[in-house]
Design a protein with these regions (language model features):
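Short helix-loop-beta connector
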Residues: 4-5, 44-47, 161-163
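Glycine-rich phosphate-binding loop plus the immediately following alpha-helix
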Residues: 65-108
Length: 190
């Protein structure tokens, strides 16, 4: 912060928001899903679906007539979250930037499915044994993140049911390979 800056109001959201509010004497706390909805509505007033993929969890918020209709969270597995991608990149001595760079230029992403971390790791090892490139595995992992979100969290069979105004949130979408995978799997083909 600039030296003369003054904090006039503060807010907190996420896991343990009430505890943090009390401990740090924060002015306001908000339930995370409501914060997601409020932010999405600010940027896309006609939002129909919100997909949040963070480092540790995923959320899908379905909206109907401008109100939250349903909220779905990932279960115990974190295979579709940012921390899993980061761990995978580090295991190959890759930075996230290099992971993305390799994934984006892949010509044949490996189909890793959308299973939990333990199964995903074994599929990755199998793909390595079969001679797939780091880029193809990275691209496959990016696709698996989105497949996991669509199939296991959102439980969507037809992506057109997401509506026309989808807002994506969460740090995992800063990964261009994941964002491109999301676009390929959810936008209608012409």
């Amino acid at each position: 912060l600039p030296p003369k800056a003054k904090i006039r109001f503060s807010g907190v959201t996420g896991y343990g928001e009430k505890l943090i509010q009390t401990a740090l004497n924060v002015d306001l706390n908000e339930i995370e899903t409501i914060a997601h909805y409020t932010a999405a509505k600010k940027f896309q007033p006609n939002v129909t679906s919100i997909v949040d993929i963070g480092g540790q969890d995923m959320k899908y918020i379905r909206l109907k007539n401008g109100a939250i209709d349903n909220i779905m969270l990932n279960e115990a597995c974190s295979s579709g979250c940012g921390s899993f991608i980061e761990t995978f990149a580090k295991s190959l001595n890759l930075s996230i930037e290099k992971f993305v760079e390799e994934a984006i230029v892949s010509k044949r992403p490996v189909d890793l499915g959308s299973r939990c971390t333990v199964f995903m790791n074994s599929k990755i090892k199998q793909a390595q044994k079969e001679g797939y490139s780091v880029g193809d595995i990275s691209a496959g992992l990016s696709y698996s993140v989105i497949k996991n979100a669509i199939q296991k969290v959102m439980k969507v069979r037809d992506v057109s049911t997401l509506g026309e105004h989808i807002v994506v949130q969460g740090g995992t979408f800063y990964n261009d390979a994941v964002s491109v995978s999301y676009t390929h799997l959810t936008l209608p083909t012409t």
